[in-house]
């Protein structure tokens, strides 16, 4: 599980907007840019190269 304090300070590296945790706690999602950043071993990977573009059915 991700640390609440860490989630409070993390922002999207593209737009600097807020991130939300997906239901499975496996990704951090930027709704504005429609990007999902993976969480591996409870560590967010905030690299654009690792981000997944969200499809319409992912929302």
Curated annotation (Swiss-Prot):
SUPFAM superfamilies in alphabetical order: Trm112p-like
Pfam families: Trm112p
Signal peptide feature range: none
GO cellular component, one term: cytosol
Gene3D superfamilies attached to this UniProt entry: 2.20.25.10
InterPro entries: Trm112-like
HAMAP family xref list: UPF0434
Family, per entry: Belongs to the UPF0434 family.
Protein name per UniProt: UPF0434 protein Mmc1_0910
Gene source species: Magnetococcus marinus (strain ATCC BAA-1437 / JCM 17883 / MC-1)
The organism's taxonomic lineage, starting at the top: Bacteria, Pseudomonadati, Pseudomonadota, Alphaproteobacteria, Magnetococcales
């Amino acid at each position: 599980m991700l640390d609440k304090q860490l989630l409070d300070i993390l922002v999207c590296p593209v737009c600097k907007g807020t991130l939300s945790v997906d239901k499975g706690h496996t990704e951090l999602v930027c709704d504005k840019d429609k990007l999902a950043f993976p969480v591996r071993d409870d560590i967010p990977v905030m690299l654009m190269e690792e981000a997944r573009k969200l499809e319409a059915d992912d929302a």
